[in-house]
Amino acid sequence: MMNIAFKQAHSGNYRRAARGKEDIRYLVLHFTANDGDTAKNNADYFARAEISTSAHYFVDENEVWQSVHDADIAWHCGTRGTYFHPYCRNANSIGIELCSRKNGEKFYFMPETVRRAQALTRELMAKYGIPLEKCCAPLRCYAQKLSCAVRRERIRVDSIQAGVTEKGGT
């Protein structure tokens, strides 16, 4: 089991709930679209003030921080009723943010960030019985005016999925 630090997000950034194992059906992999941020920086940021957005986990090359309990609903995959996946919703998913780096206009991840995200993804898939095909990457970032690098730079969840299946995932 991974060592995961916890710092509760501000109450205005998520919705308290009592989701059970059967309620969580998707993992949504995002990235922060920052240059050199850390998991702890993100946990601190989401704890400070109400910004009406959040994720459950933040992953960098050194550690993983959780800011919303799995049973609660983080606001990470759609804004005010606008969703980009036919079935995945905030209420039935867990959001994982990978801390990114930037070289010119291209975002990338440190290799250890990818390894930690793979391990976290495997752990959550096993815990909630989530199949690999229900691990999603979004088509947009938090800032609507930015073209999400997951799509623009063709950074996808392939490397994370490969690591999941290599280590005995589903």
Label each region the model flagged:
Residues Y57, I96, A117:
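Hydrophobic/aromatic pocket-lining and membrane-interface residues
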Residues M1-Q8, R16, K21, C99-T170:
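Basic/polar, cationic surfaces and motifs that engage anionic cell-wall
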